[in-house]
Amino acid sequence: MDDAALLARLVAELDHPNATRLGQALLALISSGELPPGQKLPPIRTVADQLGMSPAAVGQSWTLLRTRGIIETKTRGGTTVIGPPRSQRPQRFSQLNEVVEHTRVDLGRPLPDPRLLPDLGRALAEVGRRSHGLNLSDPPPITPQLREALAGHWPFETDDVVAVHRGIDGVEHALTALVAKGDAVAVEDPTVPRVLDILDRIGARVIPIGWLDDGPDLRELMRAFHSGAKLFVLQPNGHSPTGRSVSDAWLDEAAELVRRSEAHVIEFDNFPLLHPARKTLGVAVPEATVLIEGYSHSHGPDIQVAVMGGPREVIARVEQQIAYSHRWVSRVLQDALAVLLASDEASATVRAAANEYQRRHAQARGW
């Protein structure tokens, strides 16, 4: 397909072109093979003129496709198609699943006890009665009901929030938004295997930061920042696999390191409502903190919704990524989570579950 044919195709398919729709159209053509690897794309200004878009908007489409490894741009060689997105096997996660298949009791993953979960059926019934705006083709990134339910729950002032599919999906989106191939990333050690799989796929250089009694080693973190790391990934609450949480003193010192280094922090917390004290760097450095909260452990694994909050520019990039992939998170599940977060009965159930988990952990430590 030459430039003229490609531009004619885009003009015919895009009635109201914008950065998201243009990127989706190009991704479809690349995935189908109509734009094969090695083909040159027209200059950004040419595409902008033909579609009636600004060069900046076309550039946003190019940037996101380039971030996903679908196209590449060289200073003198223009922009070339690399090929459709490649699905890399998550090696560490696959190994964990293979071990679980031959294990009687799985202690490697913190799965919720179904007997301690709030009633999802009642929440879904309430959503069916009162939710508006379902079955829209272009819904907002987060439903008004869930945004309202989070207003009194989010642990610090943040620019914006967006719904994602579970916690690890949010982590992947945040890493993709902030990390490029070859970047150095400081990561707590140990950490969730999927995080390392995602960084492998991106092509990042991981700098492990070992956990001590009160949090990741701050001397190692300082050395990582000095060596060029501009991002730190950690679980401040209920760290998996150790179950530890950072101390208040650790938060104070770590926040000062983040300020001096001008780095970003990605925090993922799969147990935000199951710990009596929620620890986050976002209270001290909200401008640098991206927090992903998952609710499958407190409200059930069928609540396939997590929420990400952070700086406006990061959330905007994530919203673009979502628009290029699964488009949106189910509004039915978002509103069901909103109902549960606002319910006194569900909240009491979650508090009772938190107490029971703490009792079990204390008992296990005594073995």
Question: PLM ranges: what are they?
Answer:
Residues G133-E262, P272-A288:
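Conserved core of the PLP fold type I
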Residues T75, N237, D269-F271, Y295:
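Short strand-turn motif at the edge of the Rossmann-like AdoMet-binding core
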Residues D217, R244, R259, H264, ...:
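Hydrophobic multi-pass inner-membrane translocation pores used for secretion
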Residues L291-W367:
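PLP-dependent aminotransferase class I/II
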